[in-house]
From Swiss-Prot:
Record's protein name: NADH-ubiquinone oxidoreductase chain 4
The protein's Enzyme Commission number: 7.1.1.2
Presence of keyword Iron: no
Transmembrane spans: 1-21, 34-54, 62-84, 89-111, 128-148, 169-189
Pfam family, any one: Proton_antipo_M
InterPro entries: NADH_UbQ_OxRdtase, ND/Mrp_TM
Swiss-Prot/TrEMBL keywords: Electron transport, Membrane, Mitochondrion, NAD, Respiratory chain, Translocase, Transmembrane, Transmembrane helix, Transport, Ubiquinone
Record has Transmembrane as a keyword: yes
Membrane topology: Multi-pass membrane protein
One of the GO biological process terms: ATP synthesis coupled electron transport
Compartments in which it is found: Mitochondrion membrane
Length: 231
């Protein structure tokens, strides 16, 4: 069920991140060197999740692994417990909560018309559903974290915090962001471009679907204009 995926990616996964923030504050202050293995594991896990996204053929699985990769960055920056890191973690959790939920919603819009989640079978929608293609483009650009979205603010703070703590982390962070851009563009091109399937009786998009996307992306735009609400 798509509603379960949206709630899981947008709320439950982020509540786990919030729980880690509260737990880290309750722990006694220890040397940050103690946390090095956990930070390496979190960043390595984020990179592996991104690489898994690149080889996915299932649209829903790709979006789910994308959420996991972003949470790897969040966990890594929560562990070092710097003000910038915690602000970046909160910003990215909220921003990616909206983004991943919107992507799941769009995946369901595609599934209702094609009855498949295989990427190679869901192509050519830019000709018949141009408005849905616009929503796909916006959601994927937010997933890549282009400025001036909240995703960009969160990733910038996370990158700064981790780089100040250990400059070597920029290698894994840079690799992770590069792969994120690759699979996001791959997802957009696979679902929207290419020849239009002739055997599908495609319904036009409904107002309900446009309203859902507006309700996902408008709060994200508003928070981007006033980031001090959450940072």
């Amino acid at each position: 069920p798509i509603a379960g995926s949206m709630v899981l990616a947008a709320i439950l996964l982020k509540l786990g991140g919030y729980g880690i923030i509260r737990m880290m504050q309750a722990l006694p202050t220890t040397k940050t060197d103690m946390f090095l293995p956990f930070i390496v594991l979190a960043l390595w896990g984020a990179t592996l999740a991104n690489l898994t996204c690149l080889q996915q053929t299932d649209l829903k699985s790709l979006i789910a692994y994308s959420s996991i990769s972003h949470m790897g960055l969040v966990v890594a920056t929560i562990i070092i417990q710097t003000p910038w890191g915690l602000s970046g973690a909160m910003a990215l959790m909220i921003a990616h909560g909206f983004t991943s939920s919107a992507l799941f919603c769009l995946a369901n819009t595609t599934y209702e018309r094609t009855h498949t989640r295989i990427l190679i079978l869901t192509r050519g929608f830019h000709n018949i559903l141009p408005m849905a293609t616009t929503w796909w483009l916006l959601a994927n650009l937010m997933n890549i974290a282009i400025p001036p979205t909240m995703n960009f603010t969160g990733e910038l703070l996370i990158t700064s915090a981790l780089f100040n703590w250990c400059p070597t982390t920029i290698i894994m962070l840079g690799l992770s962001m590069l792969i994120t851009a690759s699979y996001s563009l791959h997802m957009f091109l696979s679902t929207q471009m290419g020849p239009t399937p002739t055997n599908n009786q495609t319904e036009p998009t409904h107002s309900r679907e446009h309203l859902l996307m507006v309700l996902h992306l408008t709060p994200l735009m508003m928070i981007s204009l006033k980031p001090e609400l959450i940072i």
